[in-house]
Swiss-Prot record:
Disulfide bonds join C3-C19, C12-C37, C40-C49, C50-C55. Belongs to the three-finger toxin family. Short-chain subfamily. Orphan group XX sub-subfamily. GO terms for cellular component: extracellular region. It holds the Pfam family Toxin_cobra-type. GO terms for molecular function: toxin activity. Is classified as a P-type cytotoxin, since a proline residue stands at position 28 (Pro-31 in standard classification). Its main location: secreted. It comes from Hemachatus haemachatus. This is Weak toxin CM-1b. The keyword Transmembrane does not apply. SUPFAM superfamilies: Snake toxin-like (SSF57302).
């Protein structure tokens, strides 16, 4: 899978949409994202997944 950098988020697809759970805020206007979305697809070599913080092959 290819990785695309969007600010500090790495995705598998350039237009991938994200959902975050920003339940913690230590500083004003700087939320800490505790979770994101994962994109997976299955091909001949098995399932490949991409998370919001890294790409796995």
């Amino acid at each position: 899978l290819e990785c695309y950098q969007k600010s500090k988020v790495v995705t598998c697809q350039p237009e991938q949409k994200f959902c975050y759970s920003d339940t913690m805020t230590f500083f004003p206007n700087h939320p800490v994202y505790l979770s994101g979305c994962t994109f997976c697809r299955t091909d001949e070599s098995g399932e490949r997944c991409c998370t919001t913080d890294r790409c796995n092959k």
